[in-house]
Amino acid sequence: MAVKNKVSNGDLKGGNVKTNGVKEVHYRGVRKRPWGRYAAEIRDPGKKSRVWLGTFDTAEEAAKAYDTAAREFRGPKAKTNFPLPSENQSTSHSSTMESSSGETGIHAPPHAPLELDLTRRLGSVAADGGDNCRRSGEVGYPIFHQQPTVAVLPNGQPVLLFDSLWRPGVVNRPQPYHVMPMAMGFNGVNAGVDPTVSDSSSVVEENQYDGKRGIDLDLNLAPPTEF
């Protein structure tokens, strides 16, 4: 802003009448007439000539008229007497924010990082069986990997067993396969542990072999005469 303060000493300079001891503000492109009014004019950079802007009652009005013409001729880089209202507001707002932040010392809390690793999140849910989701009230979809149970039959052949029904708390845990010991006799008859079963099988065995007794022969003796 081109403002000049002059202390008048009662002399007449440049057409401005000044009184003793009174400061006068001088604006760019503004002249004061002898009868007390203010004239505004600007130089046209294209035509290299002066452009008359008018006569105003106050020096501030004449200075504003000059600022408007200067922005039209030279754009935003023009030298003016007053800054734009938007520039004043933005400057005052930024200075107010800086002063308030410096006085109070309050800083905005940093944002927590987002959880982007979905595989680790699902893996943790699947490991504890979804207990964390139920405790925190979140809805989760755990992924369960069912493990087979290995059992061995008496003949030595391994068998893989899968639990088709999911039960809480029994995830990824192999289920035992109970194998009862069984004894096999030489004659193919089951010789189990249960005494009732063994007794009944013994009776059946005796009944089966009653009618199939062998011939009592001694090979060291001569055969009988009836043969």
UniProtKB/Swiss-Prot annotation:
Renumbered ranges of motif EAR-like (transcriptional repression): 217-223
Family: Belongs to the ethylene-response factor family. Class 2 subfamily.
Residues within the DNA-binding region(s): 26-83
The protein, known as: Ethylene-responsive transcription factor 4
UniProt cross-references to SMART domains, sorted A to Z: AP2
PANTHER family named in the record: AP2 DOMAIN CLASS TRANSCRIPTION FACTOR, ETHYLENE-RESPONSIVE TRANSCRIPTION FACTOR 4
Main location: nucleus
Keywords noted in UniProt: DNA-binding, Ethylene signaling pathway, Nucleus, Plant defense, Repressor, Transcription, Transcription regulation
Organism for this UniProt entry: Nicotiana sylvestris
Keyword check for Transcription: yes
Tissue specificity field: Expressed in roots, mostly in root tip, lateral root tips, cortex and vascular tissues.
Molecular function in Gene Ontology: DNA binding; DNA-binding transcription factor activity
Intracellular or extracellular location(s): Nucleus
UniProt function note: Transcription factor that binds to the GCC-box pathogenesis-related promoter element. Involved in the regulation of gene expression by stress factors and by components of stress signal transduction pathways. Probably acts as a transcriptional repressor and may regulate other AtERFs.
CDD domains for this protein: AP2 (cd00018)
